[in-house]
Amino acid sequence: MKKCLSLLLAALMLAAVLTGCGGNPSTEETDAPADTGTEQAAQTNWNVSSVTGTGTELKFRTGGDQGTYYGFGSVLAQAITTNGNGTKVTAVVSNGSQDNIEQMQMNVAQLGFVQSDVMSYAYNGERLFEGFPYADFSTVAALYMEQVQIVTCDPDIKSVADLEGKTVSIGASGSGVYYNALDILAAYDLTEDDINAQYQDFGASADALQDGKIDAAF
């Protein structure tokens, strides 16, 4: 199963930043050069936000401190800070996709990694977002496709169906891994209640597998 990881920017916070940096908005026309990046994005139907103006500070929600997202996010934040014309981006540990969207919605953060399926749930008010749709964000960039892997040290577990009754780490609640796990289990007519679910990040899952505390991990 492949998922697309996206970098999101809270649209409401973007408006606040631009207003704070630029003073009172003006309706006067200027001879400023066109934003060719935005024009190109429009031609390719990408949903992006173009950030211009003076420097600012942005909080960047990533993932667990032992996972890929935090490491990648830290490198990305440093690259933007170094080359961002005065913009300082700080990578912050988080509980994953749902947490990142919620923190942006509360104006605690301005950037975040979110898997494309979780982004859709938030926008449409589905699953854990039911009744509370979040639409105040924009996609900055699509990053890369992901593959979901199930890891086990138990030779008797040969398929997803064999996870029934087992102790399985399915990621932090609300994370992209968590939603992936539920979807994969459902494809085999299993639910969260059919396993002894553990809600651990990648690092904790690896340690638990090694110590024999869990049977498998997503």
Where is each model-derived feature located?
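A structural signal for short loop-to-beta-strand junctions that line the ligand-binding cleft
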Residues: 130-143
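Pocket-flanking alpha-helical
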Residues: 74-78, 90-131, 150-153, 203-208
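Short, low-complexity disordered leader/linker segments with a strong preference
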Residues: 1-56
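Bilobed "Venus flytrap"/periplasmic-binding protein-like clamshell domains
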Residues: 55-83, 87, 146-213
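Extracytoplasmic/periplasmic mature domains of Sec-exported, cell-envelope-associated bacterial proteins
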Residues: 36-53, 78, 111-113, 133-136, ...
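Periplasmic-binding protein-like
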Residues: 113, 217-218
